């Protein structure tokens, strides 16, 4: 995960001071890319403990098409709770857009299922994309998507994925996002009968909140440890049947967790 730590260091040294929606303030740079070879280990940050169950449960929640935070809360995951209404609803956020994008003619489009079908039938297509940035529904979302577009690519029997993240909270969010879309790549590859290739993360506004700087510096003082290995229950190949209990990380030995406030 040296690429991630190098980006944190770069923002600390060269980031522009900017104001933001939350009133917290950030150090920010614009435009950055990181690449992770998924055969070389599962890219989960080791310089602090990352909430693995939260990563996995959130992704499976997206895949189910859910938009209610109570489903996550029932599993001990509260990362979406600050933005939920009293009933737990978040509006048409990620899950709704992935699984039931509302078209202008009233149809609901299952983008994720379309991509799975196309990966099998036309693996060399350049249209293996899923977007969560539905301009017509942004105002109804309690939090517009930060990681808003991902694309799959097949070469030599391997599946790679690139994510575009318009807004990248480097200390709290990005370690989660890297792990989430790396897990998605593994699960989709298994569903369509491919091996894994790379996960490529592309960020727009890459920032550290001003009240995360001390924690970021502490993280940089820690030596990275070997990456864990992801194991998926061999009896489960259907993406839509995967549950947290089917996933296991072997060899995850991170440094202690570092806490920081969430900018809401």
From Swiss-Prot:
Q: State its Enzyme Commission number(s).
A: 2.1.1.45
Main EC class the enzyme belongs to: transferase
Task: Quote the pathway field.
Answer: Pyrimidine metabolism; dTTP biosynthesis
Q: Which residues bind (6R)-5,10-methylene-5,6,7,8-tetrahydrofolate?
A: 169, 263
Going by the entry's taxonomy, the superkingdom of the source organism is recorded as Bacteria
Instruction: List the GO cellular component terms.
Output: cytosol
Ligand binding (dUMP): 21, 126-127, 166-169, 177, 207-209
Q: Does the keyword Heme apply?
A: no
Q: Which residues form the active site?
A: 146
Q: Which UniProt keywords apply?
A: Cytoplasm, Methyltransferase, Nucleotide biosynthesis, Transferase
Location of the protein in the cell: Cytoplasm
- UniProt key word Transferase: yes
- Gene Ontology biological-process entries: dTMP biosynthetic process; dTTP biosynthetic process; methylation
The record ties this protein, via Gene3D superfamilies, to: Thymidylate synthase/dCMP hydroxymethylase domain
Record field: catalytic activity: dUMP + (6R)-5,10-methylene-5,6,7,8-tetrahydrofolate = 7,8-dihydrofolate + dTMP
> Which HAMAP family does the annotation name?
Thymidy_synth_bact
Role of this protein: Catalyzes the reductive methylation of 2'-deoxyuridine-5'-monophosphate (dUMP) to 2'-deoxythymidine-5'-monophosphate (dTMP) while utilizing 5,10-methylenetetrahydrofolate (mTHF) as the methyl donor and reductant in the reaction, yielding dihydrofolate (DHF) as a by-product. This enzymatic reaction provides an intracellular de novo source of dTMP, an essential precursor for DNA biosynthesis.
Sequence similarity? Belongs to the thymidylate synthase family. Bacterial-type ThyA subfamily.
State how it assembles. Answer: Homodimer.
Q: What is this protein called?
A: Thymidylate synthase
């Amino acid at each position: 995960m040296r690429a991630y730590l190098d980006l944190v260091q770069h923002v600390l040294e060269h980031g522009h001071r900017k104001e933001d929606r939350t009133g917290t303030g950030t150090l920010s740079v614009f435009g950055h890319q990181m690449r992770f070879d998924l055969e070389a280990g599962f890219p989960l940050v080791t310089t602090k403990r990352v909430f693995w169950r939260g990563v996995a449960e959130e992704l499976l929640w997206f895949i189910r098409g859910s938009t209610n935070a109570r489903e996550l809360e029932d599993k001990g995951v509260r990362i979406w709770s600050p933005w939920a209404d009293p009933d737990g609803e978040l509006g048409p956020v990620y899950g709704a857009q992935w699984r039931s994008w509302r078209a202008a003619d009233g149809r609901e489009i299952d983008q994720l299922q379309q991509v799975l079908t196309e990966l099998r039938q036309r693996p060399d297509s350049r249209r293996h994309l899923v977007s969560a940035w539905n301009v017509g529904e942004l105002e109804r979302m309690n939090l517009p998507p930060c990681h808003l577009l991902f694309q799959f690519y097949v070469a030599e029997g391997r599946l790679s994925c690139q994510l575009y993240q318009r807004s990248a909270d480097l200390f709290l969010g990005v370690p989660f996002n890297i792990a989430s879309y790396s897990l998605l790549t593994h699960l989709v590859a298994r569903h369509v009968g491919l091996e894994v290739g790379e996960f490529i993360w592309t960020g727009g506004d890459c920032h550290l909140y001003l009240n995360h700087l001390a924690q970021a510096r502490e993280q940089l003082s820690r030596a990275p440890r070997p990456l864990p290995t992801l194991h998926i229950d061999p009896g489960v190949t259907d993406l839509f049947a995967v549950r947290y209990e089917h996933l296991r990380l072997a060899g995850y030995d991170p440094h202690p967790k570092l806490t920081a406030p969430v900018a809401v």
